Amino acid sequence: MEDYKSEILNKICYTALVYDRINKKLNTQLEKDEIEKMIYEIIEGTDTKKFQKTGKNIYITNNYRNVRLTINSYTNRIITADRLNKKTRK
């Protein structure tokens, strides 16, 4: 399996619109530098087994932070961040 984690951490980039999208999807009001720090920490703290490449995107699922990141595998550009649905345990 390829080492997506180190490549993404070294080359991650952002578009101007993605900051607003992340704040909206995660229901936060973070500044650009806070978002970049949060994304870096999520990627760094996620086990490589939770990196899944499907088509042109890499999905990074961090259950501890309850977040899934979507990153373009060709450009290493973050596309979005989504909250995971919490399942009710019986």
Model feature map: region roles:
Residues 1-90:
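Ribonuclease/tRNase effector modules and their secretory precursors
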